[in-house]
Amino acid sequence: TNYAFKKLTKNLDLNKNLKKNISLNQLFISKINKPKKVWSSWNFDSDNNKHKQHLGTLHSIKKKSYISLNNFIKLKKIKKVDFIKLDVDGHELDVLKSGDKFLKNNKPIIFIEIAPYLYPEFGYKCSKLITYIKKLKYSFYTEDLKKIIDIDSYVKKITNGGSENFYLMKSYKT
């Protein structure tokens, strides 16, 4: 959101050593979906126009701010990505699909928030997201880096309206 982006910009201005290594880009990473508005910016001071479950507020997306992850990496001539933080409130599957070529070939570590209650709103189930992540040859790990053997059973234990963070790392066959 614009609010979060302004805060990040201000923070970087205070950290000159970090600023020279970081390029800020306010974009909507997507392969297919191009919504005109998205739920974000949790405003705890107002009850107006909040999402019924996660309480985000609706914000407009600029028309020219859409790009796929594959195209962004190509456009910016990015050679190496070590880590991706993915917390996009239901758009996870679309973001991952938008970077399919890059993710299949490079396997950066991904820190992802999985919130099963959100996905039906976007036309898919959590099982579809998990299947796609496995297809990309990633394994699931807890926040304390313990490998999850049966992710399908694990996510079924996430309470309705809840979410959990996971690390995704390259799968190795033994």
Residues covered by each model-derived region:
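Phosphate/nucleotide-binding beta-alpha loop and adjacent structural elements of enzyme active sites
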Residues: 1-174
